[in-house]
């Protein structure tokens, strides 16, 4: 009898284990299903496409763009977007762009340059209205007068947005204004130093540029207040 009772207990225990395993599997499946569902275009997004020697030569900056997309109705056919752009106002103490500052050096073998620059809000637009495409809800046609190809396209596979030739990713702890500003600073220094080296090597006599960079990111702290 004892042996029979023990067998029953073992079978009951095994049955309980099977039930628990089944529940865990179902929970996992539902979790994976939920995580694989499209999050949609709503939320805060950020984009930065890099700063190269060509930016230095052309004196054209590459801003960091922040985009905030909101649905304005339950059916999510109407959206509004707020957009901001930041870049470093890259000037010398004489308020000259880097490409012009080299022309002020003259024929010397060593030149010291000190660039003091601040991250600056250069563009802000609020409540840009857009309507979802009736055939593709992930495409939102933004109403921006005078600018063609302003469709905001959400890619559910990569959870990114394409808008105005920029690829936006969601803002998070590792992808935000501060982290991209840090990347911008590194790119700016590398590109500028490379350009100055090329200019210096082409000079007669050759000129070595010794450059100091000072960046002011106080606008980021001010935004957090």
Spans of features found by a protein language model:
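N-terminal helix-cap/turn-to-beta initiation motif at the start of protein domains
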Residues: 30-46
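C-terminal motif of bacterial Sec signal peptides marking the signal peptidase cleavage site
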Residues: 25-28
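Bacterial N-terminal signal peptides that target proteins for export
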Residues: 4-15
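N-terminal "first-domain core" detector
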Residues: 48-53
């Amino acid at each position: 009898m004892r042996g029979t009772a023990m067998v029953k207990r073992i079978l009951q225990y095994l049955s309980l284990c099977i039930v628990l395993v089944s529940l865990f599997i179902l929970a996992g499946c539902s979790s994976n299903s939920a995580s694989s569902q499209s999050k949609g275009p709503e939320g805060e997004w950020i984009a930065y496409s890099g700063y190269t020697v060509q930016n230095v030569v052309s004196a054209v900056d590459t801003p960091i763009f922040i985009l905030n997309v909101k649905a304005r109705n339950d059916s999510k056919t109407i959206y509004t977007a707020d957009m901001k752009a930041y870049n470093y106002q890259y000037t010398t103490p004489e308020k000259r762009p880097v490409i012009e500052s080299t022309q002020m050096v003259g024929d010397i073998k060593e030149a010291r340059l000190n660039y003091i620059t601040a991250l600056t809000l250069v563009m802000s637009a609020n409540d840009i209205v857009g309507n979802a495409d009736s055939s593709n809800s992930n495409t939102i046609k933004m109403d921006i007068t005078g600018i063609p190809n302003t469709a905001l396209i959400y890619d559910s596979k990569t959870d990114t947005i394409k808008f105005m030739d920029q690829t936006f990713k969601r803002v998070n702890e590792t992808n935000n204004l501060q982290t991209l500003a840090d990347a911008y600073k590194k790119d700016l220094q590398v590109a500028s130093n490379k350009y100055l080296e090329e200019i210096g090597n082409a000079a007669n006599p050759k000129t070595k540029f010794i450059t100091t960079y000072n960046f002011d990111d106080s606008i980021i702290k001010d935004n957090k207040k």
